Amino acid sequence: MEPPGEKPGEAEALSITPQLLKSHSGEFALDSILLLKLRGLGVVDLGCLGECLNLEWLDLSGNALTHLGPLASLRQLAVLNVSNNRLTGLEPLAACENLQSLNAAGNLLTTPGQLQCLAGLQALEHLRLRDPLARLSNPLCANASYWAVVRELLPGLKVIDGERVSGRGSELYQLCRDLDSSLRSGSSPGPRAIEAQPWVEPGYWESWPIRSSSILEEACRQFQDTLQECLDLDRQASDSLAQAQQALSPAETTSSFVF
């Protein structure tokens, strides 16, 4: 991705105010805000955002931020998305001791050294500097070895750019990366590749004739048995009703002569 420039349809540049925070969170007090989504508002100044002392989840993606100063006071912040901005540094985040997940893809971070400020964050496990699906990156990602440098700089990370680098499942991601590397290094002009062939034979996906199964037959048999039981019960009920009517008939005839 090219460094982020003017964002299409960017709203008028604005600074974060108490009124804006309250209207987007529905809270009356800034220190009551736990979750805040301020995506794509054209924010250039974080203003009073640092007063949201209990904020835990914050989305500032798609704005025009160049610094994160006020975030230094957000000690409870656990998840932060500042992707697609114009950041050249992340130093204020060094004070966010509870930060667990950071998305900084699509900014102007040029060297791994700019991530040194995150080294003291013991809780940080997820870091994204590049997002291929959203076509967001940072200049430092142009170096093919940036992954290794970031892992050495931040050994506590478990996920980088959405791929697990340690813990359960990391071996599979490493295998895929090694395979990609070998394919890239082995690519050279040579004999024409064999034309791809279908995976299955013609007609494989055609539907097969419906076959009766023992399960279906057993289900039909049980249904027929149940239906027969219902018919027997209905017959018994009809007989009982007829007998009851016959037993009551003399009484009704006698009572008709009483004045």
Curated annotation (Swiss-Prot):
Return the LRR repeat spans.
54-75, 76-97, 98-119
Which SUPFAM superfamilies does the record cross-reference, listed alphabetically?
Answer: L domain-like
Which InterPro entries does the record cross-reference, listed alphabetically? Answer: Leu-rich_rpt, LRR_dom_sf
Q: Does the keyword RNA-binding apply?
A: no
Where is the LRRCT domain positioned along the sequence? Answer: 138-178
Record flagged with keyword Repeat: yes
PROSITE patterns listed in its UniProt record: LRR
Question: Which Pfam families does the record match to this protein?
Answer: LRR_9
Highest taxon of source: Eukaryota
Protein name, as recorded: Leucine-rich repeat-containing protein 61
What's the encoding gene here? Lrrc61
